[in-house]
């Protein structure tokens, strides 16, 4: 099964950036933007993902864990 996550970031200048990730089972992605970074951990065996928003020093500003079923969708070929 293919899981795709799209992270959309609003930059301080009002522009948008987006990042896409294809996670087959378990992975962690680190994205840096506007002197902040986001760490996304995707674990399909537990059916959860975790997002941590950190400042440039690595201090966690916000963290949340959610059920994959909240965002799961179907895409056909």
Over which residues does each language-model region extend?
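Eukaryotic scaffold repeat domains enriched in small/polar residues
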Residues: 19-20, 63
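A short, charged, amphipathic alpha-helix used as a generic interaction element across diverse proteins
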Residues: 13, 23-48
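Short aromatic-glycine-(Arg/Gly/Cys) micro-motifs in beta-strand/loop hairpins
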Residues: 1-19
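Hydrophobic beta-strand residues in large extracellular and virion-surface proteins
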Residues: 4-7, 23, 29, 33, ...
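Short, mixed-charge low-complexity intrinsically disordered segments
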Residues: 39-77
């Amino acid at each position: 099964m293919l899981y795709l996550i799209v992270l959309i970031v609003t930059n301080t200048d009002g522009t948008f950036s987006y990042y896409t990730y294809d996670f087959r089972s378990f992975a962690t992605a680190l994205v840096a933007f506007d002197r902040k970074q986001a760490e996304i951990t995707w674990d399909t065996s537990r059916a959860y993902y975790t997002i941590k928003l950190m400042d440039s020093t690595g201090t966690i500003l916000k963290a949340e864990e959610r059920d994959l079923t909240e965002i799961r969708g179907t895409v056909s070929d």
